[in-house]
Amino acid sequence: MTPEELSLAISACLKDAVAAGEIALAESAVPEDVRVERPKNRDHGDWATNIALQLAKQAGTNPREFATILSARLKTISGVSAVDIAGPGFLNITVDAAAAGALAKAIVEAGTQYGTNTALAGHTVNMEFVSANPTGPLHIGHTRWAALGDAIARVLRASGADVTAEYYINDAGSQMNTFANSVYSRLHGLPVPEGGYPGQYIADLGHEVLTAHPDIRELTEVAALPVIRAAAYEAQMKDIKATLADFGVAFDVFFSEQELHDAGAIESAVARLREQGHVFDDGGAVWLRTTDFGDDKDRVMIRANGEPTYFAADAAYYLSKKDRGYTEKIYLLGADHHGYIHRLKAIAAAAGDDPEVNIEVLIGQLVSVNGAKLSKRAGNIIELKDLIDWLGKDAVRYSLARFPADSPLTLDPELLKKNSNENPVFYVQYAHARSRGAARNAVAAGVERQVDGADSFDASLLDHATENELLSYLGSYPSIVAKAAELREPHRVARHLEAIAGAYHRWYDACRIAPMGEEAVTDVNRTRLWLNDATSQVLANGLDLLGVSAPERM
């Protein structure tokens, strides 16, 4: 019995109790899906629900009385062996071995779809992350946002949301002029300009510009700078996209800030917000009255000299997302962007959206690496591409995804290079590789999931304590994915995979899949192969949500 099947069965029992007049609830108040969770103490049963505590007040009764009525009906469900009432009205449900074991076959049949749900169906989400300036290579700070942002997008999609992963290119403003000036100076053997960009990569970009425009040195500075700016920008974005691809991060949209300016979107945004009554003029400048929406001060949109501010571009960009039909806009920003929370929510409110529903600003903490070598090419930073070459994509992505975004993080390269259980990514990947190896060995020994074209599976044979433990973790996986999507916390998936890996290793050591020596293949062997393959599937599904590979061999 899967958690979903039990959830639907509880809902059906509730509806029957309401129809019979045993519980005084409107039928519309009965949820289609009732949340079930694994109790912390497995002596309290296989599954628990607090539905009685949720609905008792509406039914005009106390939770224990509500639970008593519901438990009588739950005991009649096929596969349920016991129902106990705990505390103020919690229902603890125990399923028999056959019902519990049936999950293994259900997982194998569901394949890559196991763990997906429709909780966020109908949600159209714009997920913006990384958005590094195109003036240099991606570094370690961007690495965490790339890993987290992509993992969040994946768990949202697994919960039914329509997600667009978007990279906002800050290609307008003074930093682009400084970037062009830095490349120009290198081309002409001049010192790095004040406030300019150092690093060998600037010289490399200069070489690319020279290759594309051999006569660039013959042009005047005024004529050369626009050419250099465009060519160096294109080359740097190509490098950024290649690095992201190597890291396994794919963006659906690369959105140019400069295009907002060129299309008149800034002026349009000011006009639209003025029509809403939120824009005013003062001191020759144009302001958005963000204090009406909880900001600590009003924000300038157009300076007195007629130049738009970055804030104006932020407003135009938000309106672009709104106009493109996104019901939810998620921004993943660094720790130095705390001040953006109120101003972005103020923009949303001024645009007529609900800042508690239509926009979400996630703030992450910085990450460091013990013993990392600074990149001379990039000017004393740790480059993402160097991290990938040094530690491997999987180790970096998994390590960054297994901690909450708002917790400071220091990566330990020595740990991540170990092929031991101390290394979390190795621990989980090895469990998957071990399960695939076990399946190959079982098949070589004559164990198949089918006999004469029919499935050979007897769930009641999965009655060992380690099998019950493993099944419990596999059964909890869908609710973990749903919670990770709801809270934007993919680390929940990583930690659960580690629990599954541990349970699998304990089961593997206790229960043989393949027969030994001349032993005959039995239904126990075949049924255990189903459980083994179910574990492989869940580990692979979970690793994929984190952007990490599931190796067949290690």
From Swiss-Prot:
The UniProt entry, under InterPro entries, shows:
aa-tRNA-synth_I_CS, Arg-tRNA-ligase, Arg-tRNA-synth_N, Arg-tRNA-synth_N_sf, ArgRS_core, DALR_anticod-bd, Rossmann-like_a/b/a_fold, tRNAsynth_Ia_anticodon-bd
Residue positions of motif 'HIGH' region: 132-142
Q: What class of enzyme is it?
A: ligase
| Key words of the record | Aminoacyl-tRNA synthetase, ATP-binding, Cytoplasm, Ligase, Nucleotide-binding, Protein biosynthesis
UniProt record similarity statement: Belongs to the class-I aminoacyl-tRNA synthetase family.
* HAMAP family to which the protein is assigned, alphabetical: Arg_tRNA_synth (MF_00123)
Name this polypeptide is given:
Arginine--tRNA ligase
Organism name: Pseudarthrobacter chlorophenolicus (strain ATCC 700700 / DSM 12829 / CIP 107037 / JCM 12360 / KCTC 9906 / NCIMB 13794 / A6)
